[in-house]
């Protein structure tokens, strides 16, 4: 009895200590106390009868500890364990409520930059509050307010006037709460003050506050930062001061900002601060010091930011979910774009600046490649990797269902299972992993001789306090590296007005897509020519002189320019650089470090064409029969390899008879049989890692409206896709008939030299800040493929078949490299005449195809009657979209 009493007293003492310690900076030091308290909880069991021996409290405290030290996966899992633990039967107030635990999960989501998860948790909390608000203390209310502001600040929700007015009212209520709690509960007052600070910051940066209101909110933030931030501990105080400094920078008040950033640094120096917080602090400090003409100190702070980014990358490599990885690396990417703007003004060595770029461009892609390299090396538990992949495939199917069919009730349950395995993956990830040494010298050695690299890098321009800009300006630094057998030189070119270039790039791409679908009018075509010339003038003309004499040009665009057909940019469509150079698109020139110098080790070819999308039915009425007027505009009868979002929803997927002809042609050159019709299942692709060449001719999809996540909505369609879209039932042989970029990214395709996607939009990429290739190309890049050839817009079925036949003649018979073979094939397609098509029996082959619709048959006959010297595919819409990407 005496021993039990002693243990009980020990448990009560630890409970009191931990109740205070886990809420503050002392949490870092309390792990031994937590471990002992956990042992006592196990000793007494669930039904101890003692109020202070509380397993739910213990699990929540463990979550707080791991969150404080930056182990977010572990924190998340312990909070979830706490939620699953039953409350004490006594219902004592010493229990940690569901509300508090869910709010802790909200904090994890904020730190992971996962607004989708945060929004779901806040929605759950709102529902709980409507049912019973008894567990919602003032502090809970303040934390919810903070989370809601984060959703608007991140852009996940769009701030409107009505919401802004509500936020203004919230500030008044919060101010009253601060006064109410100031004497009795200083910490509660401080929590209210933090919510005030975040809400005020959001309004100051918006268009919905008057100048007088902004001034008032600035004074309020100043008061909060000075009087309440210290109460919350050094780490949070540092973050709040850095946040206030950022707002002062936005207002161009760099003197005031300097005071806040100094205070933030003092708080940070007194404790351990997560790298993401430090990166934000040093980024703001670099901007402030540069504005105040302390350039060398600014550069030192900028380099500290880069050190923090490196630490984040080494930590976040443990994320096996690319969607979450992109989200969490976005913070780091923004920090780099900002501090690089400072570094380039201070450092004049182009090789040094170039090294900053190749180490920090497209950070999520780089981190994902390093992670995949570890997985593929076999250093991790293979059974765990298989379990995770199976869970990810299941989640990908559910995500695809949400995009193309309907939402699924299984989604949250499956996602939670995956999150648990992600935590296990992070725990198992080798701590002694050595990452690729990315240096300018290493990349110089790997760049192929007798070629040019053109590396575009977006950055935010740094400003001076005495000449502030009305808004943040963006520009491109372009590094041009010429490599011969004996020399490797670098030049840097500055291209200003990046925001305007991005806008014009999007417009140019949109017109090309409209023209490919025969929907562009004369005004569109006139605008296209203006944009062609202006984009050439801005993006290529400044560097074209350095490309003279070099056939191969490795282009590494940034942002939406990755979707730009550079080879047709020129003063006019009759003077294009694609006639002078062989352009190959790369994500970043550091990727030469990840690929092999020689040919890939795979053997044989996988060839798929014209899948039977709807099984057990002879034919599917083509869309042309429903919209014949529109179809008459299509030279080859409307068999474009694209389905729109609505088409997929309506299960109206036309067959692609020319893609079967194409597959048979490719088979002849490769000496391999092809899979067509019902045999063209997705499983062939998902199990093709030992092949050297992969050719897929099918429908492709990409969400041009950017309403969905391209990891799941960027996809290829295979046999059975129509059945799944109609009834939602996947089968063992055919699955759901859809392969997403996400599924492909988890394959091991290091043996594959070339993937050819003869499908619409297969080459399109989402403009995601921390990613370069984000779509089907990004999926194959992550899987380890060396080259991908695909189309940026709607691909004409007949023209694609002719192009691909010539491509494989050049690639297989003439042994040209994929980029050189594609360039030769595009040149051939532009110039091939009706007579030459007849001589190669293209019209006879097409007309003998039994799946050809009557409209397509009429179009082929009409084409065959054209004058013999007529070049039917001279227009760039037939060939310019096909792009060669080198991924590794």
Where are the regions a protein language model picked out?
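Amphipathic alpha-helical segments of tetratricopeptide repeats
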Residues: 38-46, 83-90, 123-130, 172-182, ...
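Residue signature of alpha-solenoid helical repeat architecture, marking inter-repeat boundaries
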Residues: 8, 49, 53, 93-96, ...
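Alpha-helical solenoid repeat scaffolds used for protein-protein interaction
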Residues: 219, 226-227, 231-235, 239-242, ...
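Residue at a conserved register position within TPR or TPR-like alpha-solenoid repeats
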Residues: 21, 66, 109, 203-205, ...
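Catalytic cores of enzymes
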Residues: 432-888
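"A position-specific structural signal for the A-helix of alpha-solenoid helical repeats
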Residues: 12, 16, 54, 61, ...
């Amino acid at each position: 009895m005496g021993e039990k009493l002693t243990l009980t007293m020990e448990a009560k003492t630890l409970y009191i200590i931990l109740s205070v310690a886990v809420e503050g900076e002392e949490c870092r030091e309390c792990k031994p106390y937590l471990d002992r308290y956990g042992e006592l909880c196990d000793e007494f069991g669930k039904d101890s009868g003692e109020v202070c021996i509380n397993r739910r409290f213990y699990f929540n405290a463990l979550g707080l500890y791991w969150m404080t030290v930056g182990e977010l996966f572990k924190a998340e899992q312990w909070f979830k364990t706490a939620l699953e633990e039953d409350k004490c039967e006594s219902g004592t107030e010493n229990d940690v409520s569901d509300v508090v635990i869910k709010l802790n999960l909200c904090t994890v989501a904020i730190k992971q930059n996962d607004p989708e998860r945060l929004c779901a948790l806040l929605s759950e909390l709102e529902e709980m509050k409507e049912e019973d608000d008894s567990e919602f203390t003032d502090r809970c209310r303040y934390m919810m307010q903070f989370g809601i502001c984060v959703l608007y600040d991140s852009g996940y929700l769009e701030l409107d006037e009505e919401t802004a007015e509500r936020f203004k009212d919230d500030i008044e209520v919060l101010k009253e709460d601060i006064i109410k709690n100031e004497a009795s509960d200083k910490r509660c007052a401080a929590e209210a003050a933090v919510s005030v600070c975040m809400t005020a910051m959001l309004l100051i940066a918006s268009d919905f506050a008057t100048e007088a209101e902004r001034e008032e909110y600035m004074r309020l933030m100043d008061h909060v930062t000075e009087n309440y931030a210290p109460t919350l501990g050094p780490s949070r105080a540092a973050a709040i001061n850095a946040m206030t400094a950022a707002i002062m920078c936005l207002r161009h008040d760099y003197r005031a900002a300097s005071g806040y950033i100094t205070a933030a640094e003092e708080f940070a120096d007194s404790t351990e601060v997560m790298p993401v917080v430090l990166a934000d602090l040093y980024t703001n400090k670099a901007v402030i010091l540069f504005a105040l003409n302390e350039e060398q100190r600014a550069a030192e702070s900028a380099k500290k930011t880069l050190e923090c980014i490196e630490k984040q990358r080494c930590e976040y490599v443990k994320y096996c979910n690319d969607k979450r990885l992109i989200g969490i690396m976005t913070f780091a990417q923004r920090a780099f774009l900002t501090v690089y703007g400072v570094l380039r003004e201070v450092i004049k060595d182009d090789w040094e600046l170039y090294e900053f770029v190749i180490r920090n461009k497209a950070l999520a892609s780089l981190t994902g490649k390093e992670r995949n390299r570890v997985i593929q090396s076999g250093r991790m538990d293979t059974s765990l990797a298989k379990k995770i992949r199976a869970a990810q495939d299941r989640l990908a199917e559910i995500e695809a269902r949400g995009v193309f069919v309907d939402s699924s009730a299984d989604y949250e349950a499956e996602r939670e299972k995956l999150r648990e395995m992600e935590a296990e993956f992070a725990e198992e990830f080798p701590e002694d992993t050595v990452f690729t040494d990315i240096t300018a010298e290493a990349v110089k050695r790997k760049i192929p001789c007798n070629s040019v690299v053109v590396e575009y890098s977006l950055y935010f321009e740094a400003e001076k306090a005495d000449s502030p800009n009305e808004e943040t300006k963006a520009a491109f630094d372009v590094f041009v590296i010429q490599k011969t057998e004996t020399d490797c030189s670098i030049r840097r070119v500055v291209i200003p007005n990046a925001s305007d270039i991005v806008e014009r790039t999007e417009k140019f791409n949109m017109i090309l897509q409209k023209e490919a679908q025969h929907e562009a009018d004369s005004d569109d075509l006139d605008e296209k020519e203006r944009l062609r010339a202006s984009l050439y003038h801005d993006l290529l003309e400044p560097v074209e002189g350095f490309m003279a004499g070099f056939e191969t040009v490795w282009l590494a665009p940034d942002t939406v320019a990755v979707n730009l057909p550079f080879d047709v940019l020129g003063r006019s469509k009759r003077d294009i650089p694609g006639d002078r150079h062989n352009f190959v698109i790369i994500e970043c020139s550091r990727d030469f470090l990840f690929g092999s110098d020689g040919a890939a080790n795979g053997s044989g070819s996988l060839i798929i064409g014209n899948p039977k999308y709807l099984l057990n039915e002879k034919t599917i009425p083509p869309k042309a029969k429903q919209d014949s007027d529109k179809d008459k505009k299509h030279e080859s009868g409307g068999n474009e390899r694209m389905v729109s979002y609505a088409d997929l929803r309506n299960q109206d997927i036309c067959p692609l008879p020319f893609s079967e002809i194409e597959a048979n042609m490719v088979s002849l050159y490769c000496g391999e049989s092809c899979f067509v019709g019902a045999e063209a299942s997705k499983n062939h692709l998902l199990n093709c890692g030992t092949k050297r060449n992969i050719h897929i001719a099918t429908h492709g999809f990409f969400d041009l409206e950017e309403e969905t996540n391209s990891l799941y909505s960027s996809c290829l369609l295979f046999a059975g896709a129509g059945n799944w879209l109609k009834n939602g039932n996947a089968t063992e042989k055919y699955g759901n008939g859809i392969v997403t970029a996400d599924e492909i990214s988890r394959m091991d395709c290091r043996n594959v030299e070339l993937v050819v996607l003869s499908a619409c939009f297969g080459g399109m990429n989402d403009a995601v800040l921390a990613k370069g290739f984000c779509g089907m190309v990004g999926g194959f890049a992550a899987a380890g493929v060396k080259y991908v050839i695909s189309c940026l817009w709607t691909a004409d079925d007949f023209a694609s078949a002719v192009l691909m036949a010539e491509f494989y003649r050049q690639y297989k018979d003439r042994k040209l490299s994929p980029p050189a073979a594609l360039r030769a094939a595009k040149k051939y397609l532009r110039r091939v005449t009706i007579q030459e098509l007849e001589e190669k029996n293209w019209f006879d082959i097409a007309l003998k195809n039994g799946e050809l619709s009557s409209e397509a048959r009429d179009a082929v006959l009409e084409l065959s009657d054209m004058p013999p010297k007529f070049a039917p595919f001279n227009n760039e819409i037939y060939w310019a979209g096909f792009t060669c990407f080198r991924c590794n």
